Amino acid sequence: MAREYKIEDYRNFGIMAHIDAGKTTTTERILYYTGKSHKIGEVHDGAATMDWMEQEQERGITITSAATTTFWKGRDGKMRRFNIIDTPGHVDFTIEVERSLRVLDGAIALLDANAGVEPQTETVWRQAEKYNVPRMIFCNKMDKTGADFYRSVEMIKTRLGATAVVMQLPIGAETEFKGVIDLIEMNALIWRDESLGAQWDVVEIPDDLKAKADEYREKLIETVVEIDEEAMEDYLNGIMPDNDKIRALVRRGTIDVKFHPMFCGTAFKNKGVQPLLDAVVDYLPSPLDIPAIKGIDFKTEAEIERHADDSEPLSMLAFKIMNDPFVGSLTFARIYSGKLEKGTSVINTVKDKRERVGRMLQMHSNSREDIEEAFAGDIVALAGLKETTTGDTLCDPLKPVILERMEFPEPVIQIAIEPKTKGDQEKMGLALNRLAAEDPSFRVKTDEESGQTIIAGMGELHLDILVDRMRREFKVEATVGAPQVAYRETITRQHEEDYTHKKQSGGTGQFARVKIIFEPNPEGEDFKFESKIVGGAVPKEYIPGVQKGIESVLSSGPLAGFPMLGVKATLIDGAYHDVDSSVLAFEIASRACFREAAKKAGAQLLEPMMKVEVVTPEDYVGDVIGDLNSRRGQIQGQESRGITIVISAHVPLANMFKYVDNLRSMSQGRAQYSMTFDHYSPVPSNVAQEIQAKYSGQK
């Protein structure tokens, strides 16, 4: 089967925005006008095509990005193939946005005309900057009370530090919003309400808006000629670029991420969507317009490039794993080069494992169609892959390459979880592993000390939804607890202890004497053991028993039973008995010796200190620092990054629970933070007493 659409006619793009800016509704309208949906799904009815998980339809938010292929005839009458990814706007799901942006060529950033640039808009914008994704802007909800297009344009400059090139002006606002002025063609488009937005009339620009339209067209031309010397020279000499030239310059500037063309409308009221689709064709890149993807040669580790060309060796990136109720596990992959046929064997170069592509599917939200072959630029769902996880490269076994991996954020919140019944224990393990395979920002581990299963994720809503999915999809009922901090213990001063173990009770007795110096290990947190025995006071074969005895006590410290760190033990003397001594006797002696010594060597409680980085607009710096100080945090420094301030601090993990909620309310949701483990630090004595009182009862 030959390629149906040329690669230059592909547009792989995503729709990104703050929660509630109308992303899913806009995608629904795109699917409706491109003929993929026969009935428009409304989010507030819980019927949107792209929101296909039960929780999404209940909560009215998009959690997983669904990929959809659809088609659109451009202004030139030629059909184009769109691969669209709908992404979530909630901060707990940034991983979904991150992985979508990694495999897309362009994006539409959606703004709510009433709110303008919102906190999550800033977050996803920063993510798109990281991957250098060309973006257009659609100012949605122009029919809403308080809608202000011009304020939104200003906020793009002040909050995002970006340049918006205004391509359309609104005609009316709020309930009076009727249509838009096209600043290239210099005419007005007025939608007919009775046609569900499918028809509009092209009319003259209203008299009261002519001066404004002239002013904004002038601004548009001024901005775009700057990227082309010849056009700039002509412009300075009074020669204006024609409409085709303007479009060509807007396309170039958008693809080079010099500026962002901006449009307006209301997806819900069906106005402005078709010109937006024409703009996707005119201004967003095809796979040929963006730089070739870089990778590393699997064998030589040299850098290589893969171009968007069917004749190149196959390379693709798995960017999402999803459980489908009918097909089982589906791996979404973007094909960067070469072509893929059903039944082909490919190699996963990250895991160094062969995989066979059983079925290949073209996805439309949650319905699907089987395909035999896919080409460079396609986004496909593959069934039957066993080893592949998010971020892995799949490629031609004869020309292996490892494409740049995705970076996944570390989880910032963890809670203990246990099944409600014994029968659910095994099912819970399977469910958690399946969910972790789908979502790299979700981790599962067993706490060795408490035996509890700990789940970690990007926020409370994130974990909430995963526990909910476990109940719905895997029928596992679970109880969720509060997380506990993994404290440690150590000693702070040198102490010498002499201990004799004697047991005489008929038959062979037990005898061992050890003299050991215990002190903090100057080389770090590990345990260090040395023997300085001379003259055979303790025979060589018994010395491993001395070390083993001390090590067995390290797992439970004298204060609250937490593992001990940073201890050094030096065996300096001892005594033995020809008949009654044994390795076991010396193990028992050294164990008791350390237990005695630990109490006298200045035992101290340690707590995990987290490296916390808060990215916040300047207005909230004082509040953020004050709050971190109140959490026993130590501020390490601050620096400006673009139009935000980055604050670094070390904060005890025990004081970071619920921080995400506090930070959101403190900064109206505009600040973000990341947290990683840094080091263990002594617990202040007043806090240590509370912890000891709490845990010594559990020992």
Swiss-Prot record:
GO cellular component: cytoplasm
Ranges where the tr-type G domain occurs: 8-288
Origin superkingdom: Bacteria
InterPro entries linked to this entry: EF-G-like_DII, EFG_II, EFG_III, EFG_III/V, EFG_IV, EFG_V, EFG_V-like, G_TR_CS
Major localisation: cytoplasm
Binding site for GTP: 17-24, 86-90, 140-143
MF GO annotations: GTP binding; GTPase activity; translation elongation factor activity
Pfam families registered for this protein in UniProt: EF-G_D2, EFG_C, EFG_III, EFG_IV, GTP_EFTU
GO BP term, pick one: ribosome disassembly
Keyword DNA-binding in record: no
Subcellular localization(s) per the UniProt record: Cytoplasm
Keywords on record: Cytoplasm, Elongation factor, GTP-binding, Nucleotide-binding, Protein biosynthesis
NCBIfam families registered for this protein in UniProt: EF-G (TIGR00484), PRK12740.1-5 (NF009381), small_GTP (TIGR00231)
Database matches in HAMAP family: EF_G_EF_2_B (MF_00054_B)
Family to which this protein belongs: Belongs to the TRAFAC class translation factor GTPase superfamily. Classic translation factor GTPase family. EF-G/EF-2 subfamily.
UniProt function note: Catalyzes the GTP-dependent ribosomal translocation step during translation elongation. During this step, the ribosome changes from the pre-translocational (PRE) to the post-translocational (POST) state as the newly formed A-site-bound peptidyl-tRNA and P-site-bound deacylated tRNA move to the P and E sites, respectively. Catalyzes the coordinated movement of the two tRNA molecules, the mRNA and conformational changes in the ribosome.
Designated name of the protein: Elongation factor G
The encoding gene: fusA
